[in-house]
Amino acid sequence: MTILNHTLGFPRVGLKRELKKAQESYWAGNSTQEELLNVGRELRARHWQQQQQAGVDLVPVGDFAWYDHVLTTSLLLGNVPERHQNADGSIDLDTLFRIGRGRAPTGTPAAAAEMTKWFNTNYHYMVPEFQQGQQFKLGWTQLLDEVDEALALGHKIKPVLLGPVTYLWLGKVKGEQFDRLSLLKDILPVYQQVLGELAKRGIEWVQIDEPALVLELPPEWLDAYQPAYQALQGQVKLLLTTYFDSIGHNLDTIRALPVQGLHVDVVAGQDDIAKLNAKLPQEWLLSLGVINGRNVWRADLSHWFERLQPLVNSRPLWLGSSCSLLHSPIDLSEETRLDAEVKSWFAFALQKCAELALLTQALNAPSEAKLAELAAYSAPIRARRASSRVHNPQVEQRLAAITAQDIERQQPYEARAAAQRKRFNLPAWPTTTIGSFPQTTEIRGLRLDFKQGRLDGKNYRTGISEHIKQAIAEQERLGLDVLVHGEAERNDMVEYFGEHLDGFVFTQNGWVQSYGSRCVKPPVIIGDISRPEAITVEWAKYAQSLTDKPVKGMLTGPVTILCWSFPREDVSRETIAKQIALALRDEVEDLEKAGIGIIQIDEPALREGLPLRRADWQAYLQWAVDAFKLNAAVAQNDTQIHTHMCYCEFNDIMDSIAALDADVITIETSRSDMELLESFEDFAYPNEIGPGVYDIHSPNVPSVEWIEALLRKAAQRIPAERLWVNPDCGLKTRGWPETRQALANMVLAAQRLREEQV
């Protein structure tokens, strides 16, 4: 039996982020819809061709999305929120963008769909909205149109469709509550219609994605798979596709389904391939995701050959990427600044396609020459294990020497709080901001000129110092109590620290999609992490010299740096997080020596890092909390440690939030009307809290009365003496005019509440 290979999906944005640029040009009114559609057609044709040329047997179609693939599925099913609907009920590209970006058909603002993380990745999807009695119909033929495009170009294809149970699982009920699973019977006819249309086009296999099968689903959701797939069988062959974790716990349900094949992620999952092979129906095709779609490391193809060879001829077999290559940059050959050794360790999406082809060829026709080719390809990643670029004995010794004492502050919170009150003598309702101030064109230009060599270090530092001086002066004029330096020197909260730590490298074009038109370029952690010199001390010390008020030192926490980077695969995530924590622990110590008495360690990704299955949560939370404490615990009693977190669900991890033992936590609460504080109230959270009093993602300026009312609500849940007053998040993306006005109103609201206490 000949083994075939395939990818589960390919990056959409284009090597030069062509899709992003075309989207934003269209949204700004600078280009026509036809011009945007042409860019999409060109990208799809190029990506299909590139995959085919790299040796992919079956290229995916339907993985392209104008904004997000879950949103595309919503439109396919005719699921458009009423506030975004065209008057005649039609669906077009503008409908899709309105849902993603927040507009009514009239052009007036209307709430965008909620956005949240796609499983445990850094990609975000638009959450489907469901209402009782809702009707579904085939409303958007993008998938069928793209299948026609690919067939016309002569490609061997495999359409990709998000499965019905996972689609419902990912959504939320709006309005009157009901069981959204009850809508399954209503969406299945649309799926049947789509599969019928694909059958008419001569399609043999359809990849139907059901990643919810890696989760610990409630019994009623697991039971829904059987009737769903009974309804979908018979028109085409279905490759039930899972990824991001193992499926062993749901295997009994899976193997009873009327499908013809199963794709399993054997990179992220711990499934035993031999046992899986033995337990599946003999006639099923087994697709093994052996090439990591979520990281940038070259595969050890010799290793995979040894693991897979016993399966050859045991059943129909395909090899694939572990998940969609959406999460990987496109082409390593474009990276001209990486040194040769490091570059030899990497593989981006196109190189991963070539890896699949090489491994498939070797398994189909093994020979000494082919095995030598696999060994030669795998040699750099094997040589890496002994590279001095990877291993730093001092870091490894320091990590091994960590004791329980290293992760605990000297005294409990009550004693520290007394020492801090004495040192800072802050008023009731102390006001502060989260860290960053508006990144003006001038600031971005200054950094770019320095990075590209048009500006020397001395003039760059002079320019940044001037912006810090302005930020301090603005805050003093506004009457804020605890100041920040404004972060003019920072392009990104993770990249900035990665650039100053050993163990990281950066790409030129390693862009991956975050959501819509937003792309990120994660750093790559290649080895043991250490801090060669102080990172933030110079700027914090300068800012503090300009004012008698306390200035916060600003650090990104170890878990967030880990989660927002491409990590090593040869050590555990815990090891990486603790290495970062040790490096930043030294930064905390140096900030203290420089006279900085308040230090903020941001951990917005703490909750994002949770494993997919709740059974694995406790182990993760233990080391994540320990990493934060290792970072912070070196601080003296009268040094106040702040942390900032911006997400909307604390209930299920409150024990861990409290265990961080930060003196002050600032959180995002304005959009929930302070309801998030309920978790802290119920838990009787003992330390100080700064609930965000206005939404920095909106240009709207909150009134004094609005902020005052929110603070009064907060004081009903948390004792006023433990409350801080601050925005929801950093102000990097805002302009100065609305920033000044919003902060002035915030300070005035705090002053009014203080006056009541006198």
Swiss-Prot record:
It holds the Pfam family Meth_synt_1. GO terms for molecular function: 5-methyltetrahydropteroyltriglutamate-homocysteine S-methyltransferase activity; zinc ion binding. Keywords: Amino-acid biosynthesis, Metal-binding, Methionine biosynthesis, Methyltransferase, Repeat, Transferase, Zinc. It comes from the Bacteria. Its cofactor is Zn(2+). Binds 1 zinc ion per subunit. The active site is at H697. 5-methyltetrahydropteroyltri-L-glutamate binds at R17, E18, L19, K20, K117, R518, C519, W564, E608. L-homocysteine binds at I434, G435, S436, E487, D602. Zn(2+) binds at H644, C646, E668, C729. L-methionine binds at I434, G435, S436, E487, D602. Coiled coil: none annotated. Its EC number is 2.1.1.14. The keyword Amino-acid biosynthesis applies. InterPro entries: Cbl-indep_Met_Synth_N, Cobalamin-indep_Met_synthase, Met_Synth_C/arc, UROD/MetE-like_sf. Pathway: Amino-acid biosynthesis; L-methionine biosynthesis via de novo pathway; L-methionine from L-homocysteine (MetE route): step 1/1. Catalyzes the transfer of a methyl group from 5-methyltetrahydrofolate to homocysteine resulting in methionine formation. Belongs to the vitamin-B12 independent methionine synthase family. This is 5-methyltetrahydropteroyltriglutamate--homocysteine methyltransferase. It comes from Yersinia enterocolitica serotype O:8 / biotype 1B (strain NCTC 13174 / 8081). The gene is metE.
